[in-house]
Amino acid sequence: MPFLITIPAHAEWTRYAQLAESEEWFDPAIVRRDQDRITFWTMTNYTAPITSLEGQELLSEQALTTVDCSLGKIGSEKVIKYAGKNAQGAIIGSMETTLRMTKVSANAADRILLEIICAK
């Protein structure tokens, strides 16, 4: 069954990781919850421009992210790429895919995110 998902216009972003190449943020507002699966928006700000598959430079992206708290998995089904930081500026690309989830490793930044979201 199709459903409409909107991009958070006035999200209250919370930083959960500072890496050498990026800052990782999440919006604590839950888009959807289905038992142990929680869907919400994440945002990545890159410290330096990266080149997209389309050959354009981007500084940030948002992803519609789902975690499975019982299985310790994470995945994204929609990604929107922006020319500027904080999901600002021109949208230079987007992609929607079928949700494929992967196991989160113990020392990954996504482990921090999983623990925060699953504690809600």
Identify the role of each PLM range.
Residues 8-120:
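N-terminal secretory-pathway/extracellular module detecting exported/lumenal segments
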Residues 1-6:
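Bacterial N-terminal signal peptides
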